[in-house]
Amino acid sequence: MIIRGWAPQVLILDHPAIGAFLTHCGWNSTVEAVSAGVPMITWPVHDEQFYNEKLITEVRGIGVEVGAEEWSLIGYQERKKLVGRDCIEKAVRKLMDGGDEAKEIRRRAQEFGKKAGRAIQEGGSSHQNLTALIDDLKRLRDSKPLD
């Protein structure tokens, strides 16, 4: 399937046919993949994406790297060090081959997805934090004198 223009990424990631997500490791995409419980193949380009990649692959163990090494100041531009097709193939096979490491990565990704789901439910940590923020903003608004 080819989608032109904006794609409903959250809906796509939630589809049961999705086995992995090739991501540039932007924070929004990372959070969406984690929330969906989908393991990631990481390909950072610039800014904080290389740090996010380390969080995904080394700290949390919910993805594999393609081996991008060259950081770019302006994002998508010509590179001196290209990621070759053999590196991409290796990352895809590592995650999709059904071996023990792939199963463990998938298990951890699904575990994080369940945790993320609980966090946004009523009473969950994200729900509580957002509710506290709203309450603080209301108190701040109500404490200001009317002009």
Regions found by a protein language model. Give the residues of each.
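Catalytic core of nucleotide-sugar-dependent glycosyltransferases
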Residues: 1-147
